[in-house]
A protein has these predicted regions:
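Low-complexity, Ser/Thr/Pro/Gly-enriched N-terminal "stalk/linker" regions
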Residues: 1-34, 52-56, 60, 69-71
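Solvent-exposed loop and edge beta-strand segments that line ligand/cofactor-binding
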Residues: 21-40, 47-48, 83-100
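Hydrophobic core/packing positions within alpha-helical solenoid repeats
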Residues: 39, 43-46, 107, 127
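Helix-terminus loop motifs that line ligand-binding clefts
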Residues: 51-114, 118-121, 128-131
Length: 131
């Protein structure tokens, strides 16, 4: 068994590209959306063998950041499935809550494995707004 090969295959199978953004779904059948915590952990794992995809994972999360800095806990990239947060929230493509902050840690872990000051400079204002 080649664990690294299997992990790479799993991540490739669970990779999605929507509206120009790349992300990883935790489980295509059960959880077909992008989740904040999951994506942060996916990015950390990806940083070991595909740092560019790790960066794209975080950039896709930050693409749906609200003006007040909140990053939603779920992004419904694929419409028409389950949208339990639509009522009372007024947005049909994101969740109405967030999750504990993992974004900066994920960004730092990516940077530790594949130093990229330009990437950190690009996302720093959004991270600051989130925290």
């Amino acid at each position: 068994m080649d664990l690294e090969k299997e992990v790479r295959a799993l991540y490739l199978n669970n990779r999605r590209i929507k509206n120009g953004f790349q992300f990883t779904v935790p489980s295509p059948g059960t959880y077909p959306y992008q989740w904040l915590w999951d994506s942060c952990f996916h990015a950390i794992v990806l940083s070991h063998f595909d740092p560019e995809s790790a960066k794209k994972e975080l950039l896709s999360l930050l693409s749906r950041q609200l003006p007040d800095g909140m990053v939603p806990h779920v992004i419904f990239w694929k419409q028409g499935l389950i949208r339990p947060y639509e009522w009372g929230w007024g947005k049909d493509d994101i969740g109405s809550i967030t999750q504990p902050p993992m974004l900066a840690y994920a960004a730092w872990e990516i940077h530790r494995r594949a130093p990229d000051g330009a990437f950190l400079e690009k996302i720093y204002p959004q991270l600051l707004a989130y925290y």
